[in-house]
Amino acid sequence: MLKAVKSNFQVGIDNQFKLSEAATIADKSELDKKTLKKELGDLRQELAELQHQLFAEDKRSLLIVFQAMDAAGKDSTIRSVFNRVNPAGCQVSSFKQPSSLELDHDFMWRSNIRAPERGKIGIFNRSYYEEGLVVRVHPDYLKYQRLNDLPETLDEKNLQGFWQNRFESFNDYEKHLARNGTLVLKFWLNVSKEEQKNRFLSRLNEPEKNWKFSSGDIKERALWNDYMHAYEELINHTSKEHAPWYAIPADNKLYMRVQVARTIVENLRAMNPQFPKVEKKESEKFDEMRNLLESE
């Protein structure tokens, strides 16, 4: 079964993660812009090369999950880190409000059909983990799933066992993927409440960013503490050796992107994908084919 290598900001599997102790910004000594840009460029190039080998090998795959509060930088991080990767070997899926078709299936269905094929990198911009985050903060959403085992009162006390079952479903699914050749890496982009405020103000004050803002963002921000509670419990229950969480400081976007890229590259290095070897019967024809081409 595939397992991740240990990296910076990796959450342990001992159920001791404290969200209040997780950094949102690095030390100033680590924030030199020139140094970070150079490292990010090098990591992008290596990521492109490793992805090419993974695609050619066509035996294993990588699933990368991004979760965060609004304005943490999920979209821009995906765009930045993967900007040299061959689009043919990479697929990005965004998960928003479920459609009527998706609600007619179990809650993992829409994610499972978007899982990466062998040889590919799958990127989830939000994911099945919304079922233990936004749905937990807004338990009334469960009514639309037409489940037959819900308590009459959808409060935290009555739903505690329900959420434990969902955590088990997440873990079982990721273990199944790992056993079948898909490594799962999960990034929680940890933006501070103050930095989120600044980014929201930027979206309001700069016309070219207005489209990114919704009044609903402010309503969700008012539930910040509820979300932090949901994140802490979810991360503690679902960070595993085969599918770890990484709590990445997100107040400085460039630093965040470097940490994400570095973690992905370190894991692909450990996977060590190989170009397939040509069968001897075929390689024996190479000289003949070369001579035919050169004689044209």
Residue ranges and their predicted role:
Residues E46-F55:
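Pre-Walker A adenine-sensing motif
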Residues F66-F82:
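Glycine-rich phosphate-binding P-loop
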Residues P98-L101, S127-E131, P139, N190-K197, ...:
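Conserved nucleotide-binding/hydrolysis micro-motifs of P-loop NTPases
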Residues R136-F167, H176-H229, P276-S283:
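A glycine- and Lys/Arg-enriched "phosphate-lid" helix/loop adjacent to the NTP-binding pocket
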Residues R60-S61, G119-I121, G181-L185:
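Loop/turn-to-beta-strand initiation segments
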Residues L223, Y227-E232, N236-E296:
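NTP-dependent small-molecule kinase module
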Residues M1-R44:
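Charged, amphipathic alpha-helical linker segments immediately N-terminal to NTP-binding catalytic cores
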Residues E30-E39, A88-L159:
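Conserved nucleotide-sensing/catalytic segment adjacent to the nucleotide-binding pocket
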